[in-house]
Amino acid sequence: MNFYVDTSVWGGYFDKEFSEWTVPFFEQAKQGRFTLVLSDVTIGELQNAPKIIMELTTAIPPQYIELVSITDEQLELADQYVKEGALTPKFHSDAQHIAIASIIKVDSLVSWNFKHMVNFFRIKQYNSINLKYFHPIIDIRTPKEVTYETEE
């Protein structure tokens, strides 16, 4: 399994509201249960975050992280999300995350962004646009939904 992880998940590790599910998600990534896909868009956003959040990226063994750079094709798809009203220009970076994850065919984009990403109606919009332009559909989930259950 490979999961594109947006910036909200990295920050969720240290957030009381989200850490209950984010910490186990990253622990399982460290164990190699899945590969985390990290884009240059995410890295750029993390550089503006508190240092402790950026340092979390180095806690994942490199063999379980795939680094990707945004392509012209992905930028064009992100632009289409905005042009067709799925997102406003203010949230173009969210459109970029979704476009990258769509085109590289990850198993899921993982996010805590309920307004723009983990949102049933918006996912329908993204997938409609993806299909219109012959791109794969995208699955978007929270860390809670993709973390393996542990027996207690």
Where are these regions (language model features)?
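General small-molecule cofactor/ligand-binding pocket signal
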Residues: 37, 68, 139-141
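Active-site neighborhoods of divalent-metal-dependent phosphate/nucleic-acid chemistry enzymes
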Residues: 66-125, 147
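Acidic, PIN/NYN-like endoribonuclease modules and their adjacent C-terminal/linker elements
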Residues: 1, 15, 43-44, 104-152
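Short, charged/polar low-complexity linear motifs in solvent-exposed/disordered segments
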Residues: 29-30, 72-73, 94-95, 128, ...
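Residue-level detector of alpha-helical recognition elements and their boundaries
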Residues: 22, 61, 93, 116, ...
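Short, well-structured N-terminal submotif of metal-dependent ribonuclease cores
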Residues: 1-38, 44-59, 65, 83-89, ...
